[in-house]
Swiss-Prot record:
Highest taxon in the source lineage: Eukaryota
Record-level GO cellular component terms: mitochondrial inner membrane; mitochondrial intermembrane space; mitochondrion; nucleus
Keywords: Apoptosis, Disulfide bond, Endonuclease, Hydrolase, Magnesium, Metal-binding, Mitochondrion, Nuclease, Transit peptide
CDD domains given in the database record: NUC
InterPro entries hit by this protein: DNA/RNA_endonuclease_AS, DNA/RNA_non-sp_Endonuclease_sf, Endo_G_ENPP1-like_dom, ENPP1-3/EXOG-like_nuc-like, His-Me_finger_sf, Non-specific_endonuclease
Record protein name field: Endonuclease G, mitochondrial
Cofactor: Mg(2+)
Self-association state and partner proteins as the record states: Homodimer; disulfide-linked. Interacts with crn-5, crn-4, crn-1 and cyn-13.
Length: 308
């Protein structure tokens, strides 16, 4: 865990999210004080054995980029898959990912000649057990989009790279108009614009299932499921972006958005939250290997002196 986000921007973002769009009286937003952690240098972490999807020619992927993509730490180690351009942890219960991590550079964000999104097909990753897979039929007539976690627009360096973003393991049910096709897309494009100016960018994205205070005064976690395979519909989504501005110096942005229609007039900065709020909500440690002192700006607020 890197630590709490300071500054009025983060506080305002939490208030907006909790008040207008989020579930009521969430403890993660009322108390975001960091728990005591064991220093990372006292923990020995082994990288998980990752599997290359068998439904595409694994040899075409070349050497694994997992060490490069996951340089700043794995948020978890459950059912990890390494694709050409991103790493994913899959949740058998919800039929969606726990998290997806992307590593972007200006070079890797270039749109290679001949790469065509229209050639991509939504399909299950058959390296996971059949009984835990979602299918296209689960989404049909559900009222939800097959929403990308690792954005297809980030991975146009090769046809294989963009094809792999269409695995259903990288999808989660998202409200279409007003969210997936609008505000969520705005956030993806924002991260891509910033990443084109940075040395390296690391983006971790995932679903959330947050509690809501109901009329009886008790809090419940409730979410819809769709299709014969009971694919879970998240109540919210998170995205954490780590941008390397200069060698060894980073800017961090953390967001939680409701899986709901969001007005066009609302700025994405309104959904800034402390990183600690994301971690508590998701049950994940994000960028745990990163030295907190290397973060020079969080959610737009400078910390620890000037970078320039």
């Amino acid at each position: 865990m890197i630590g709490k986000v300071a500054g009025t921007a983060a506080i305002a973002g939490i208030s907006f999210l909790a008040g207008k769009y989020s579930n009521d009286d969430l403890p993660i937003f009322r108390n975001v004080q960091s728990a005591t952690n064991v220093p990372m240098n006292q923990i020995q972490v082994s990288e998980p054995m990752t599997v290359k999807p068998a439904s595409l020619n694994a040899d075409a992927m070349g050497p694994s980029r997992s060490a490069e993509i996951m340089k700043h730490g794995y948020p978890g180690f459950t059912n990890v898959r390494t694709y050409e351009d991103f790493v994913l942890s899959y949740d058998y219960k919800t039929r969606t990912a726990h998290w997806v991590c992307e590593h972007l550079t200006p070079e890797r964000l270039k749109h290679a000649e001949g790469v065509d999104r229209k050639l991509c097909e939504f399909k299950p990753d058959i390296t996971f057990p059949q009984k835990f897979l979602s299918q296209n039929t689960d989404y049909k007539c559900s009222g939800f989009d097959r929403g990308h976690l690792a954005a297809a627009g980030n991975h146009r360096k090769s046809q294989l790279a963009v094809d792999q973003t269409f695995y259903l393991s990288n999808m989660s049910p998202q409200v279409g108009r007003g969210f997936n096709r609008d505000k969520w897309n705005d956030l993806e494009m924002h991260c891509r614009r910033v990443a084109k100016k940075m040395i390296n960018s690391y983006i971790i994205t995932g679903p959330l299932y947050l509690p809501k205070l109901e009329g009886d005064g008790k809090k419940y976690i409730k979410y819809q499921v769709i299709g014969d395979n009971n694919v879970a519909v998240p109540t919210h989504f998170f995205k954490v972006a780590l941008f390397e501005v200069t060698p060894g110096k980073f800017e961090l942005e953390s967001y939680i958005l409701p899986n709901a229609v969001i007005e066009d007039t609302v700025e994405i900065s309104k959904f800034h939250v402390p990183l600690d709020a994301v971690e508590r909500s998701a049950g994940l440690e994000i960028f745990a290997r990163l030295d907190p002192k290397s973060i020079v700006k969080e959610n737009g607020a400078k910390k620890g002196g000037l970078l320039w």
